[in-house]
Amino acid sequence: MWDQKWVIGNWKMNGRLQNNNALMHRFRIHPTAERVLIGLAAPTVYLLQLHNAMQIVLNNRILTCAQDVSRFPNNGAYTGEVSAEMLADTGTDIVLIGHSERSLYFGEKNEIQRRKMENVLNVGLIPLLCVGESLEEREAGKEHEVIAHQLSILQGLDTKNIAVAYEPVWAIGTGKVATVEQIADMHAFIYKEILSLCGSDVKIRVLYGGSVKADNAADIFAVPYVDGALVGGASLSYDSFTAIISAAQNA
């Protein structure tokens, strides 16, 4: 896992039961990509469906990922919340933390994201922390400062396995893609920060998550310190998503 390329598809608020089943069955014919860890982050209501399909149809070749988790650690009067323990019950393996849309629409900041990270780790799941700067922050030359602040929640966590997705907010859903030089700079910076915060013996995966498509995936995977991709809209298409997986396998 920690020496593979990761390709995680984030469905966001998309999916229906019938369409999900059809997609899972199409994956039956896709050849095994031994060098790639594949995951799908579905809406919570579909996690158990995906997990069961992955066991029955795909022999666990694709991991179940959740898009979010509650900041509250235990059961209680938190209407609408889903705890880390509940996600574990669905067979979830990986949990996204701090996606830019959670910050944009729900105002989530470091304190909440830290609590979510701890909850996920406490039940044995893998958190995937999302970090990234806005266009205004990049144009002001503050991208390193912003990312360092977001990564600071990693300090003191009881884990030696750190997964981060760098998602420049200005390149999500806009059709814009950071240059190879920009991606290389930010991923190298993130690696350096993680090692400083967590120690030299930590295992690291840093994914790129800014409008990854079938036609740019190979170039992105060739960038130093890019360990995979967090894929948005392209993960809803079997052909596009499997093309990205193939690019990772061949990187």
UniProtKB/Swiss-Prot annotation:
It is found in: Cytoplasm. Transmembrane segments: none annotated. Its EC number is 5.3.1.1. Keywords: Cytoplasm, Gluconeogenesis, Glycolysis, Isomerase. This is Triosephosphate isomerase. GO terms for molecular function: aspartic-type endopeptidase activity; triose-phosphate isomerase activity. It comes from the Bacteria. It catalyses: D-glyceraldehyde 3-phosphate = dihydroxyacetone phosphate. It comes from Neisseria meningitidis serogroup B (strain ATCC BAA-335 / MC58). Homodimer. Belongs to the triosephosphate isomerase family. Pfam families: TIM (PF00121). The active site is at H99 (electrophile), E167 (proton acceptor). Involved in the gluconeogenesis. Catalyzes stereospecifically the conversion of dihydroxyacetone phosphate (DHAP) to D-glyceraldehyde-3-phosphate (G3P). InterPro entries: Aldolase_TIM, Aspartic_peptidase_AS, TIM_sf, TrioseP_Isoase_bac/euk, Triosephosphate_isomerase, Triosephosphate_isomerase_AS. Pathway: Carbohydrate biosynthesis; gluconeogenesis; Carbohydrate degradation; glycolysis; D-glyceraldehyde 3-phosphate from glycerone phosphate: step 1/1. Substrate binds at N10, W11, K12, G173, S211, G232, G233. One of its GO terms (biological process) is proteolysis. One of its GO terms (cellular component) is cytosol. It is an enzyme of class 5 (isomerase).
